[in-house]
Amino acid sequence: MASNRGQLNHELSKLFNELWDADQNRMKSGKDYRISLQGKAGYVPAGSNQARDSASFPLFQFVDEEKLKSRKTFATFISLLDNYEMDTGVAEVVTPEEIAENNNFLDAILETKVMKMAHDYLVRKNQAKPTRNDFKVQLYNIWFQLYSRAPGSRPDSCGFEHVFVGESKRGQEMMGLHNWVQFYLQEKRKNIDYKGYVARQNKSRPDEDDQVLNLQFNWKEMVKPVGSSFIGVSPEFEFALYTIVFLASQEKMSREVVRLEEYELQIVVNRHGRYIGTAYPVLLSTNNPDLY
């Protein structure tokens, strides 16, 4: 393994595979959704908003929305996606209704086996308090507490917005958006134009049933040269992984190497003080671990 990739974390690999197996809300490839990978994406120079289009059709060919929205954690998650102002530098205003939606989502995921297992693990590590309510408050602060991305500006971002919704830097640079449901919904609204897959070095092309992908896309005219995302997994699965990695370290940037099913991944979590700045999976066989 290359030295800059770090050593495999066996403890987290075991835990994350247990969480993967417990993820009962995960959508199944070929049954609950279908994707079309099409062509391999081209190189996009830094700062460019031009990308060769190697995909004539959307990435998502089909998603069983009825099933998606019948699952409480997905339904409450989707209700949060329209609560944010896309541009950093524009102050966020959080309404009482949005606070209630945040709490409904946390209540829903805390009922799942995945989050109960994650909570139990964190309690054993003295990284979370044993009561569910205290853990919920901790999750709320980590993920939903607003902060400023630029020094001196008003609160304009939070971990949830960056990771799951996506945001822009002065309307010129695409940041975040590492979630497959948001990708699908934005693609459906014609806000996302999928440009092609970014291949792993040891594999000529991904498979249609791969559940971790590197993608290139335009979002509202801004290019994301490489965006990595789990596909099909539940919101609670991603919340669990990223929260565990965040709480395990005080480092500005945590990179935990894990083996999850067939994938060797780096789970990257960047902290913004006491909050999550960004979080995403990186397929280690790609040559660009520094996705943003």
Swiss-Prot record:
This is Poly(U)-specific endoribonuclease-A. Transmembrane segments: none annotated. It comes from Xenopus laevis (African clawed frog). It is found in: Nucleus. PANTHER family: PLACENTAL PROTEIN 11-RELATED, URIDYLATE-SPECIFIC ENDORIBONUCLEASE. Its cofactor is Mn(2+). GO terms for cellular component: nucleus. Keywords: Endonuclease, Hydrolase, Lyase, Manganese, Metal-binding, Nuclease, Nucleus, RNA-binding. Monomer. In vitro, optimal manganese concentration is in the range of 5-10 mM. It comes from the Eukaryota. The keyword Ribonucleoprotein does not apply. Disulfide bonds: none annotated.
